[in-house]
């Protein structure tokens, strides 16, 4: 699983769930400030990623994730090679 594949999955999920244009979502996009996402949206995204990739995202790490890039970096670094 490449970082780009993780990014595309996160971008597509957010575009669908938050009804925003996928083209507006980049690494520096902030969940609250740019996407008007609340904490529930972020929790739902993280649970989706945990379930999809078979990883755990500790609460203390999740609390630091303010941008799309931060989530993508964490997931990409912790996904086993053959995860899809």
Q: What would you call each of these model-derived segments?
A:
Residues 1-41, 47, 51-84:
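Phosphopantetheine-dependent thiolation modules in NRPS/PKS and related acyl-activating systems
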């Amino acid at each position: 699983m490449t970082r780009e594949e993780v990014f595309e999955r996160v971008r597509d999920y957010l575009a669908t769930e938050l009804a925003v244009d996928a083209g507006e979502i980049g690494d520096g996009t902030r969940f609250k400030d740019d996407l008007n996402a609340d904490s529930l949206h972020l929790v739902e995204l993280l649970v989706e990623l945990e379930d999809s990739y078979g990883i755990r995202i500790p609460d203390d790490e999740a609390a630091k994730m303010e941008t799309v890039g931060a989530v993508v970096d964490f997931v990409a670094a912790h996904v086993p090679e053959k995860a899809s």
